[in-house]
Regions:
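Hydrophobic alpha-helical membrane segments
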Residues: 1-312
Length: 312
């Protein structure tokens, strides 16, 4: 397996190509994103209903009367079901994206193509299980090391309390050591996410086994770690700047409309949020696919998308 090295400029090239790809096939991607959001909301509703029924019978406000062991078992069962059902759907996203990126015809049916191949489905489940175990081991090991060294360990209780109570003053009072450890978790999580998504493309789009796909994803990430970290840093700055501008413009628009009708402003805010989600899903999968294709896959250049073909 040849693992190719990419530069920061290559990664920005994938990002630009992703925007163009989503723009060219806007309708197909939006329908796929709508199906995905509907599936997520349905799973979240069912999960909430199951857990809620598990807590039924508890006195109002009496946390001690809840059977937490039963809740934990239900939560574990939900995670197990998700581990079985979700991977083929994600694989379908990469199949759909790959066809569009390579200029092939694609349809919403490609989202569910992973469910029709039992052998591949088993590989996807195995990959998801291995990835989950590795993620817990690495992140858990990092947290244990930080606690053993006393880095931010004294602030964990304060952080959890501040999160639950939405207390910004308590958050501001956390030590610099805690924030350094917290930044480390985010960094490690981002690197692991990249490795797992590269490996997931490998297991979903090739005949490579689950274990070898995990190894390939990790190896490809480590080989491109320097460029990846620089790209992440640059993107962090870009995202912060873009978020501030978008939030300001959206806030001004919603505030202006709320002066006329608060219900319309609330509905507009919900619509803008949903549109953002509908755009993020295709962009994310497009970038990950192009990343995999040029580093682990066929290595061909991304399909050319002219500016005249982009429909935004």
């Amino acid at each position: 397996m040849e693992i190719r090295k990419a530069s920061v400029s290559d990664m920005f090239g994938w990002l630009i190509s992703s925007f163009k790809l989503v723009g060219k096939y806007w309708g197909t991607f939006m329908l796929a994103a709508l199906v995905s959001l509907a599936a997520i909301f349905l799973l979240a509703f069912v999960a909430g209903l199951v857990i809620g029924l598990g807590a039924a019978g508890a006195a109002m406000g009496d946390v001690n009367s809840i059977d937490w062991q039963k809740i934990a078992l239900m939560y574990a069962a939900i995670l197990l079901v998700a581990l079985i059902l979700v991977p083929p759907f994600i694989a379908g996203w990469f199949v759909l994206t790959g066809k569009l990126a390579d200029g092939q015809s694609a349809s919403l049916g490609d989202l569910f193509s992973g469910y029709g191949d039992a052998t591949r489905w088993k590989k996807l489940i195995a990959f998801g299980f291995i990835g989950a175990v590795l993620n817990i081991a690495v992140q858990g090991g990092y947290i244990l090391i930080c606690m053993a060294l006393g880095i931010g360990s004294d602030d964990i209780g304060q952080f959890m309390s501040a999160q639950l109570n939405n207390d910004p003053e308590a958050m501001a009072g956390l030590s610099s050591g805690f924030w350094a450890a917290y930044a480390g978790i985010i960094l490690i999580g981002s690197v692991l996410q990249t490795a797992f998504m590269l490996g997931f493309c490998q297991v979903a789009l090739t005949d490579t086994g689950a274990v070898d796909s995990v190894k390939d994803g990790i190896a490809a990430t480590l080989k491109n770690l320097g460029s990846l970290l620089l790209f992440m840093l640059a993107m962090l700055l870009v995202v912060i700047a873009a978020a501030l501008v978008i939030a300001l413009l959206a806030g001004l628009l919603i505030a202006a409309i709320s002066m006329l009708n608060s219900n319309i402003a609330l509905a507009l805010g919900a619509v803008l949020y949903i549109l953002l989600l509908l755009f993020i899903y295709p962009l994310m999968f497009s970038f990950q696919y192009l990343f995999w294709r040029d580093v682990l896959g066929g290595g061909g250049k991304p399909a050319t998308v002219s500016d005249s073909e982009v429909l935004i």
